[in-house]
Design a protein with these regions (language model features):
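Cationic, low-complexity basic patches in intrinsically disordered or flexible, solvent-exposed regions
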Residues: 4-8
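Glycine-rich phosphate-binding loop of ATP-dependent small-molecule kinases
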Residues: 14-310
């Protein structure tokens, strides 16, 4: 039965993914083409509809104990933070948290790569919105020449396993990439730099990214292809227009939640123990007359300490 549920889950996601692919212009980055933007009147109607739908769904998420993790990745100045702000206006503050993932601290760098992101995953029945996540850190390391070859492949494999562990354990994982072209990015940066109260938002890396737009696009495209899975696919969002961006995000978010709720058991839980469990004897069955010599004790203790060190 568990295997059937898992197969059904994958089938539902693949079907939903395929049906909506054309609707949202869903391809990998370099071959991506924008979806068709509705006219002004239709936009207004659809925005109102999807905002209300998300508001209604939050109680169902709570009721069904569905954890929802939403990642916003994309180009600098694409509006990731502001879009999160628009989405959470439709959700009770008790049911979500927002995390902005800046550069890792020295303490975090001494831990496994995904450690700081694992701390942010939501509890049952709640949302977590990540303003940039493990994609941004990975591609920055690639662009800086710090991650390549086998090390890159191991990083990708760890990310795929992590995302699969989340979905196998009942999480809905939605990954958005906010797409704008080089000229639009440059225009937005110039606007931010022209005002004293916003120019701090443009970093040296942001400027470098615009100057090396094509190189960055190649790295982004490779990463997205490597981490695109049926259970946690990438959704490329046309981020040129604010209202159109919001509508795309809300439609994908609400329809993703609908699918997850319809298939309440998202997947088979992961087995936590990979070793066989031995039956423990009752206390009354433990012999109390056994002894061990001092030399044998030291020898066995040393063996076990060495084994533990391995």
């Amino acid at each position: 039965m568990a295997q059937y549920v898992q197969q059904l889950t994958v089938f539902l996601f693949q079907t939903w993914y395929t049906v909506n692919k054309k609707k949202w212009g869903l391809n990998m980055l370099k071959s991506w083409t924008p979806g068709e933007e509705p006219d002004k009147d239709e936009m207004k109607v659809q925005l109102e509809k999807t905002r209300n739908r998300l508001y209604d769904l939050q109680m169902k998420i709570k009721e069904h104990k569905l954890p929802v993790l939403v990642l916003f990745e994309g180009w600098s100045a694409a509006g990731k933070g502001s879009m999160i702000g628009k989405v959470i206006r439709n959700i009770d503050p008790r049911f979500f948290k927002v995390a902005t993932m800046s550069a890792p601290t020295e303490e975090e760098l001494r831990r496994p790569f995904l450690y700081r992101y694992m701390k942010q995953i939501p509890e049952e029945g709640k949302f977590t919105f990540l303003d940039s996540g493990w994609m941004e850190q990975t591609v920055k390391e690639v662009l800086n020449g710090e991650l390549e070859g086998d090390a890159y492949e191991r990083r990708i494999e760890s990310i795929r396993r992590f995302e699969r562990q989340l979905t196998d354990n009942g999480y809905l994982v939605l990954k958005f990439f906010m797409e704008i072209d080089k000229d639009e990015q440059e225009k937005r940066m110039k606007k931010l730099l022209s005002k004293d109260d916003t120019k701090w938002r443009v970093t040296g890396f942001d400027k470098w990214q615009n100057k090396h737009y094509k190189k960055c696009e190649n790295v982004f495209d490779r990463y997205m292809k490597d981490t695109n899975m049926s259970s946690s696919p990438w959704y490329i969002i046309d981020a040129e227009s604010k209202k159109w961006t919001e509508l795309q995000v809300l439609e994908i978010l609400t329809e993703g939640i609908d699918v997850a709720l319809a298939n309440n058991a998202m997947a088979v839980p992961i087995l936590q123990n990979v070793f066989s469990m031995e039956k423990m004897p009752l206390l009354s069955e433990i012999p109390l007359d056994k002894t061990i010599g001092e030399d044998e004790y030291k020898k066995e203790l040393k063996r076990l300490q060495n084994r533990l060190g391995e």
